C-alpha cells in the first residue's frame, strides 16, 4: 500500500506543458527517417554504431550548418563519440573542435548542449537525438532556431555499452554517477568537449522504464506516470545520486 500511495502522490503532481511541448506527444503516427525506423529493422532493433556514423555523415554532407566531430574514442571497441555542432557561423573545413567552439562562443548566441544515451538500455534517448539531428538538417522550423542558438548534439555517449545493450559501460560502470570524478574515459572526453563550449543550456536525455499501467482501481504493481509526458527536470548530477 505504501508504494502505491507514493506513486499516486507522484502522479497527482500535475504538470501542464505549453502547446509547444505538448504537440510533440501527439497520438498521431509519426514518420522518422533515422536508421532504426527505415523499415529494414525488426521492431526490437535499434541503430547500430555503424548505422549511426553513416547516418551522421549523410546528414553532415546534406547540411550547410552541421559540423561533425569526434569527442574521442571508447576504451574497448574503439568507437567514435560523435558530436554534431549546428551553427550559422562560418566554420572552416579544417577547424578543430576547439577552434569551432571558440567561433560559436563568439557569435553572441545561446549555446545548447544536447546529449543522449548515457544509459544504453534507454534507446529512445539516442534515437530521439538522431531525429533531432535530422530535424536541424531538414526541417525549416528547426533550422530557423539557429538564428538564435548554437546547438551541440551528442547522440550516443556510451557506444560500447550500446553495443552490449547494457545500462553501464563495457566495464560495468554507470557513467551517470561519474560526472564529478570522471573515472570513465568516455565521460572524461565528453566533459573535455563540453568545457570548450560551456553551454548555458544542457539537456541530458534518458528514457523512463515502463512496468505496466495501473488497473482501474490503482492496485497493480506498475509504475506508470500518466501525466509526465516523459519529461523530467533535475538540478544536477552528483556523486551522491542513488
Which role does the model predict for each range below?
Residues 1-242:
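M14 metallocarboxypeptidase catalytic domain recognition
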Amino acid at each position: 500500500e505504501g508504494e502505491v500511495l507514493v506513486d499516486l502522490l507522484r502522479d497527482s503532481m500535475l504538470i501542464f506543458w505549453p502547446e509547444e511541448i505538448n504537440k510533440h506527444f501527439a497520438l498521431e503516427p509519426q514518420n522518422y527517417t533515422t536508421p532504426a525506423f527505415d523499415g529494414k529493422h525488426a521492431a526490437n532493433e535499434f541503430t547500430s554504431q555503424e548505422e549511426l556514423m553513416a547516418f551522421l555523415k549523410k546528414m553532415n554532407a546534406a547540411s550547410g550548418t552541421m559540423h561533425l566531430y569526434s569527442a574521442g574514442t571508447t576504451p574497448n571497441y574503439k568507437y567514435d563519440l560523435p558530436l554534431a555542432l549546428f551553427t550559422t557561423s562560418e566554420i572552416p573545413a579544417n577547424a578543430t573542435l576547439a577552434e569551432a567552439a571558440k567561433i560559436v562562443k563568439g557569435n553572441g548566441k545561446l549555446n545548447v548542449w544536447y546529449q543522449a544515451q548515457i544509459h544504453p538500455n534507454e534507446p529512445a534517448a539516442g534515437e530521439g537525438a538522431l531525429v533531432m539531428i535530422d530535424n536541424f538538417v531538414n526541417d525549416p522550423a528547426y533550422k530557423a532556431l539557429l538564428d538564435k542558438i548554437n546547438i551541440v548534439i551528442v547522440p550516443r555517449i556510451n557506444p560500447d555499452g550500446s553495443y552490449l545493450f547494457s545500462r553501464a559501460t563495457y566495464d560495468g560502470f554507470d557513467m551517470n554517477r561519474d560526472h564529478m570524478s570522471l573515472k570513465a574515459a568516455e565521460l572524461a572526453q565528453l566533459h573535455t568537449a563540453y568545457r570548450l563550449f560551456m553551454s548555458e543550456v544542457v539537456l541530458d536525455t534518458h528514457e523512463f522504464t515502463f512496468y505496466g499501467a495501473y488497473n482501474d482501481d490503482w492496485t497493480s504493481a506498475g509504475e506508470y506516470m500518466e501525466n509526465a509526458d516523459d519529461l523530467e527536470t533535475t538540478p544536477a548530477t552528483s556523486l551522491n545520486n542513488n
